[in-house]
Amino acid sequence: MTLKELVVGFGTQIRSICMVGSNAFKKRETRMYPEEPVNPPPRYRGRIVLTRDPDGEERCVACNLCAVACPVGCISLQKAETKDGRWYPEFFRVNFSRCIFCGFCEEACPTTAIQLTPDFEMGEYKRQDLVYEKEDLLISGPGKYPEYNFYRMAGMAIDGKDKGEAENEAKPIDVKGLLP
């Protein structure tokens, strides 16, 4: 071992000690999580919830677009129909042990029924407890879009009623009558 190698080795040791010493008095970036609350950013994609429309009914119309858009296939549902012709999910299941929280289901939903909340604390001891059913996902409020009601906006026909006869729906305009 030469004198040059000793000086270089000693210099690197001194540089490392100085670096550790300079960082010892800086502000810590690590948060002590359970004691200090963590505030996620405003557009954080966390747990999935199902919302209700302003009338208190389920917004989900079981169109199955969310399940098709999901890249990992963690959403499953079965469509059923009420007496007045409206669709609803007979069951709606999300497997959070597979979910990657990408938000594709929220983007695909035409009724804004699926919304992602900033809730991220979903630790469980058994994987089966991470499979949420419709009752676990439904919240009492309308979520991010309080005034939106899919059936009023879409103008979908309801059993026994023609277009324009449903609640809060105008008669269709005869386009041919507008021609000169």
Swiss-Prot record:
Which cysteine residues pair off into disulfide bonds?
A: none
Q: What organism, scientifically named, is this protein from?
A: Pectobacterium atrosepticum (strain SCRI 1043 / ATCC BAA-672)
* HAMAP family for this protein: NDH1_NuoI (MF_01351)
Q: Which UniProt keywords apply?
A: 4Fe-4S, Cell inner membrane, Cell membrane, Iron, Iron-sulfur, Membrane, Metal-binding, NAD, Quinone, Repeat, Translocase, Ubiquinone
Q: Where in the cell is it found?
A: Cell inner membrane
Give residues annotated as binding [4Fe-4S] cluster 1.
C60, C63, C66, C109
EC supergroup of this enzyme: translocase
Q: What is the protein name for this chain?
A: NADH-quinone oxidoreductase subunit I
Reaction(s) the record says it catalyses: a quinone + NADH + 5 H(+)(in) = a quinol + NAD(+) + 4 H(+)(out)
Q: Which GO terms describe its cellular component?
A: plasma membrane
* Function comment: NDH-1 shuttles electrons from NADH, via FMN and iron-sulfur (Fe-S) centers, to quinones in the respiratory chain. The immediate electron acceptor for the enzyme in this species is believed to be ubiquinone. Couples the redox reaction to proton translocation (for every two electrons transferred, four hydrogen ions are translocated across the cytoplasmic membrane), and thus conserves the redox energy in a proton gradient.
Describe its partners and assembly state. NDH-1 is composed of 13 different subunits. Subunits NuoA, H, J, K, L, M, N constitute the membrane sector of the complex.
Q: What is its main location?
A: membrane
Q: Which family does it belong to?
A: Belongs to the complex I 23 kDa subunit family.
Q: Where does [4Fe-4S] cluster 2 bind?
A: C70, C99, C102, C105
Per the UniProt entry, the Enzyme Commission number(s) are 7.1.1.-
